[in-house]
A protein has these predicted regions:
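Substrate-binding/catalytic groove segments of enzymes
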Residues: 123, 132-143
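Acidic interhelical loop/turn segments
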Residues: 140-152
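Short non-catalytic regulatory patches outside canonical folded cores
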Residues: 19-34, 50, 54-58, 63-127, ...
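Amphipathic, well-ordered alpha-helical segments in soluble domains
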Residues: 13-17, 38-48, 64, 71, ...
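Amphipathic, Lys/Arg-enriched alpha-helical patches that create a basic surface
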Residues: 6-14, 20, 149-200
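N-terminal, Lys/Arg-enriched amphipathic/low-complexity engagement segments
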Residues: 1-38
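Amphipathic alpha-helix face/heptad-repeat signature
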Residues: 6-9, 38-41, 64, 117-120, ...
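Structured alpha-helical bundle/scaffold domains in large eukaryotic membrane-trafficking regulators
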Residues: 80, 84, 140-143, 176, ...
Length: 200
């Protein structure tokens, strides 16, 4: 089975993130504080997914994947793209840009239009919505031959855990960069490459 191995890899990654992001200092401006709040929420969702998976509560773990992705993308956009007026609107709970627009503006800003995030949105978004909003993707995995319970294929669980690991690691990298932890960049890049190369 793939999922126990992937779960252990995720748990070890979460420990690494916690050890390397604890106690970081950040500028206290609105842009930074809003962005790091999003990244911290993303990392918390990553840990929640691991915890839920350890108890075989896969439906709830899968439902959090979209929320994790949204937390990450909002943080990226707030930090790199939002105008002062948009930051103020966000603080009032009135951000009127959809997920794809946030991705497009962020990828354009960093010079990678139609990049990794766009590809993720194209390939995974419909199923993530289905899991989060109790659509067919979620409901169709609630039946087994003998009883009503979650029935998630092992390879799907492993893939979900891998996605959670990668998204949380991106959030952690943003925290390191925003706190000017240049001495950790090489270690971070090695860890990210190692994680990506051993993904199941």
């Amino acid at each position: 089975m793939q999922s126990p191995l992937e779960h252990e890899r995720l748990v070890q990654l979460i420990k690494w993130i916690d050890e390397n992001t604890a106690g970081l200092a950040f500028p206290a401006d609105d842009r930074t504080m809003l962005a790091i709040g999003c990244f911290d929420v993303a990392i918390e969702h990553q840990a929640a997914i691991a915890l839920l998976a350890s108890a075989s509560i896969h439906g709830s773990a899968f439902a959090l994947l979209r929320v994790l992705a949204e937390s990450l993308v909002r943080g990226l956009w707030l930090h790199a793209c939002a105008t002062d007026a948009e930051l103020a609107k966000f603080k009032r709970g009135k951000l009127d840009k959809n997920f794809q627009t946030l991705i497009n503006e962020y990828e354009l800003k960093i010079g990678t239009p139609s990049g990794v995030l766009s590809n993720f949105k194209t390939t995974a978004w419909d199923s993530l919505n289905g899991f989060t909003h109790t659509g067919f993707h979620q409901v169709s995995r609630r039946h087994t031959p003998s009883r009503l319970e979650g029935s998630y294929p092992d390879e799907e669980v492993a893939k979900a855990l891998g996605v959670a690991g990668a998204l949380g690691m991106i959030a952690a990298g943003q925290l390191l960069a925003m706190s000017n932890q240049a001495h950790l960049f090489d270690t971070y890049n090695k860890k990210m490459t190692e994680y990506a190369n051993t993904a199941l």
